[in-house]
Amino acid sequence: MKYGYFKSPIGIIKISYEENIKKIELVDEISGKASNDKILLLFKNQILEYLAGERKSFDHLELLNPEGTDFQKSVWQALLKIPYGKTSSYKELANEIGKPKAMRAVGTAVGKNPFLIIVPCHRVIKSDGNLGGFAYGSKVKRNLLKIEGFKNQSIK
């Protein structure tokens, strides 16, 4: 496994990869020897463009290779359908994947999304309009939603 790190407005981002991207996550510090391969630079540049408000979608999604159950992968695929600047609820996602009673399981799968920003789990909020959980905290989630045009008062 190779790793690349870069600093961003939301913190240090780590990309784990081999031939494909395995994980994109926020970390507290850079640890170990970092690589600088083409695949890393491809995603690093897209993420930085997004964080600067210059990109609304991502290219080369076929290079994402998540490890997870079929159920988790179906949830992550559904997340990719949530448009930039829009939100969805856990209930709507459960309906989208044909499992309307599986809201909690959907929430768990959303929380295990291995691809920060690229697979937009930050766009999922509670049905009542509350922000809901986020693996990297509500401040990061709010910041990502602000980039997409949400105002603080539009999210509870």
Where are the regions a protein language model picked out?
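Short Lys/Arg-enriched helix C-cap and helix-to-coil transition segments
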Residues: 117-124
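Basic nucleic-acid-binding alpha-helical/helix-turn surface characteristic of O6-alkylguanine DNA
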Residues: 1-101, 147, 151-156
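Histidine- and aromatic-rich ligand-binding microenvironments
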Residues: 83, 114-117, 129
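Asparagine-centered polar/low-complexity signal
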Residues: 95, 110-113
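…primarily DNA-binding HTH/wHTH and HhH modules…
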Residues: 128-156
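Regulatory, non-catalytic segments
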Residues: 101-106, 110-111
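Short, hydrophobic/aromatic-rich beta-strand segments within well-structured domains
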Residues: 12-16, 105-107, 118
